[in-house]
Design a protein with these regions (language model features):
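Periplasmic alpha-helical coiled-coil/stalk elements that build and connect Gram-negative outer-membrane
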Residues: 2-3, 35-38, 159, 164-278, ...
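Acidic, low-complexity, intrinsically disordered peripheral segments
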Residues: 2-4, 27-46, 61, 428, ...
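Bacterial N-terminal signal peptides
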Residues: 12-21
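Regulatory alphaC helix of protein kinase catalytic domains
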Residues: 47-75
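Amphipathic alpha-helical coiled-coil scaffold segments and their short linker/junction regions
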Residues: 71-79, 217, 221, 251-320, ...
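Small/polar (Gly/Ser/Thr/Ala-rich) solvent-exposed segments
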Residues: 84, 107-124, 137-163, 283, ...
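Amphipathic alpha-helical coiled-coil segments
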Residues: 85-100, 164, 168-188, 193, ...
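Membrane-embedded beta-strands of outer-membrane beta-barrel proteins
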Residues: 131-133, 337
Length: 477
């Protein structure tokens, strides 16, 4: 009778116990860390004092059915697929952390081995079931650095969500401001048609009475047609921006817009003092640097040995497995201490080290570029705001003198007959041109306020997005 090894039941029991104990581990990492769903600059690095978030109750609400700027931004952020895409990428990177952490746990594998072997006094074919466990004991930081790199990649994905939110908020604000701009310009253009039409009516009346020439009527009617063409141009731009806003809001058509100046902007360029440390692009560069540093350390650790413990069990399926050695047991168990050292990998380890070093340099440059772009954008917006503010003051002061000249020309044309119709038409057109410029300048200032908030990292605060859940993630200061 064949002698049975007393170690076989022992090892089988040990493997059974390990399988039972490790079963929760196999199922524990089936989701990302819940903390990854809370995103904010202050959570990603040692940030300066965060700008206080607007309370949810402070969110601008619609005036009746009218849509405010902050409400439009929030509506877009709650549904837009670009944010959903960024959140999905975060979940992917979160699972990457679980993959990296799996290196800390035992790796159990099993399978069927078949082949040709020699020894035991002869050569033979053999088939065997194999069950093995491998537990890393020490690897000079390979797994630690892999986890650090995965965590940095997740942080970068978080910063990307903030960047997508900021870009979407800026685009929605632009569309809201432009739609409102052309609403106002269309209203002024309609007033212009009525004003020039009244002058054309007077010119026709005077022509019928013989008090003026037919050329006055032709000139006046030409100005009326020009005013109508202006209205059609503004109508075309209005439809364009209204369609853009509707797409950002996920609607067929947006509701009417609030008429009040958005309090969320509050002359942001005149008080902008944000820190570039809150900018998503800077946070992404910092996360890329941390990831590159971890990958560089991991690549260097690859050149060092890995110490692991490896128990395994083989169960032969051949009927003549012990043909050449009758003392050979069908089930064999062993435990081994492995020291694995890479000898030659075709230069892969060196290449990975160089690649990580280049990525580290690129991350430093990306941070510098992000800060430079933000400073430049902020400086340009503030400089333009200063110039447009002075122009706005001049336009407002000019309105009174233009109105006075229009009234004077009207009396001289109608009562005294000393002023030609062309002067009256020019004065009328100058009034409305000034109103067009006033409305356009005010809208330009609103756009520049959005730029200042964007380039100072304060856009989410201004629109009340902080402290809110957007498509599964919590936005924090």
């Amino acid at each position: 009778m064949k002698r049975r090894s007393p170690l076989s039941p022992l090892w089988l029991g040990a493997f059974g116990l390990l399988a039972l104990n490790l079963n929760p581990v196999a199922q524990a990492a089936d989701d990302i860390d819940p903390r990854l769903r809370t995103i904010g600059p202050s959570l990603m690095r040692d940030a300066p004092d965060a700008i206080p978030a607007r309370p949810p109750s402070g969110q601008a609400t619609s005036n009746g059915d009218r849509l405010g700027l902050a409400e439009a931004v929030l509506t877009a952020a709650q549904w837009h697929p670009s944010i959903a895409e960024a959140v999905g990428n975060l979940y992917k990177q979160g699972e990457g952390i679980n993959v990296a952490r799996a290196g800390y746990y035992p790796q159990i594998s099993g399978g069927l081995r078949t082949g040709y072997d020699t020894g035991y006094g002869g050569d033979r074919n053999s088939q065997a079931l194999n069950l093995s466990l491998k537990q890393m004991l020490y690897d000079f930081g390979k797994v630690d650095n892999a986890v650090s790199a995965a965590q940095a990649a997740a942080t970068r994905a978080q910063a990307n969500i903030l960047l997508v939110v900021d870009d979407l908020a800026r685009d929605t604000a632009y569309a809201w401001i432009e739609t409102r701009r052309y609403e106002q310009l269309m209203a002024i253009a309609r007033d212009q048609i009525r004003g020039v039409g009244d002058i054309a009516g007077m010119a026709r009346q005077r022509s019928d009475m013989g008090a003026s020439t037919r050329s006055d009527v032709v000139q006046a009617e030409s100005r009326v047609e020009g005013a109508r063409a202006t209205l059609e141009e503004y109508q075309s731009q209005y439809e364009r921006w209204r369609s853009t806003l509707a797409e950002l809001l996920g609607r067929v058509a947006p509701p009417a817009l609030a008429e009040e100046t958005p309090p969320e902007l509050n002359q942001a360029c005149k008080r902008s003092s944000g820190s570039s440390d809150r900018l998503p692009a800077v946070l992404m560069a910092l996360a890329l640097r941390a990831q590159s540093q971890a990958e560089l350390a991991q690549a260097k650790a690859e050149a060092y040995p890995t110490l692991s413990l490896q128990p395994q069990v083989n169960h032969y399926l051949d009927n003549d497995y012990n043909r050449d050695n009758r003392s050979l047991d069908r089930t064999q168990a062993g435990i081994y201490l492995n020291v694995e050292v890479p000898i030659y990998q075709g230069g892969a380890i060196s290449a990975r080290s160089r690649a990580a070093g280049h990525a580290l340099s690129a991350a430093d440059s990306a941070e510098d570029a992000a800060r430079l772009q933000a400073r430049r954008g902020l400086a340009e917006a503030m400089a333009q705001t200063s110039g447009l503010s002075r122009r706005l003051t001049s336009l407002e002061a000019r309105q009174a003198s233009i109105q006075e000249a229009r009234q004077l020309y009207g009396r001289q044309y109608l009562d005294l007959g000393t002023r030609p119709l062309l002067d009256l038409l020019n004065a009328e057109q100058e009034i409305y041109q000034s109103r067009f410029e006033l409305a356009g300048t005010r809208s330009d200032l609103l756009r520049l306020d959005v730029d200042c908030l964007y380039n100072s990292g304060a856009l989410r605060t201004a629109f009340g997005l902080e402290g809110r859940n957007l498509q599964g993630v919590e936005i924090e200061p």
